[in-house]
Amino acid sequence: MADTTGRIPLWLIGTVTGIPVIGLVGVFFYGSYSGLGSSL
């Protein structure tokens, strides 16, 4: 394990930034697939 004292763990950054990105991408592709992507 790397020493993460005084720093934010990379896995925490990845989780916090990854979940919203995956959600937005999922909504975008779902909207495009259902024909609503162009109206957004």
Curated annotation (Swiss-Prot):
The keyword Membrane applies. Belongs to the PsbJ family. PSII is composed of 1 copy each of membrane proteins PsbA, PsbB, PsbC, PsbD, PsbE, PsbF, PsbH, PsbI, PsbJ, PsbK, PsbL, PsbM, PsbT, PsbX, PsbY, PsbZ, Psb30/Ycf12, at least 3 peripheral proteins of the oxygen-evolving complex and a large number of cofactors. It forms dimeric complexes. It is found in: Plastid, Chloroplast thylakoid membrane. The keyword Oxidoreductase does not apply. It holds the Pfam family PsbJ. The lineage of its organism: Eukaryota, Viridiplantae, Streptophyta, Embryophyta, Tracheophyta. The chain crosses the membrane at residues 8-28. GO terms for biological process: photosynthesis. Keywords: Chloroplast, Membrane, Photosynthesis, Photosystem II, Plastid, Reaction center, Thylakoid, Transmembrane, Transmembrane helix. This is Photosystem II reaction center protein J. One of the components of the core complex of photosystem II (PSII). PSII is a light-driven water:plastoquinone oxidoreductase that uses light energy to abstract electrons from H(2)O, generating O(2) and a proton gradient subsequently used for ATP formation. It consists of a core antenna complex that captures photons, and an electron transfer chain that converts photonic excitation into a charge separation. One of its GO terms (cellular component) is chloroplast thylakoid membrane. It is a single-pass membrane protein.
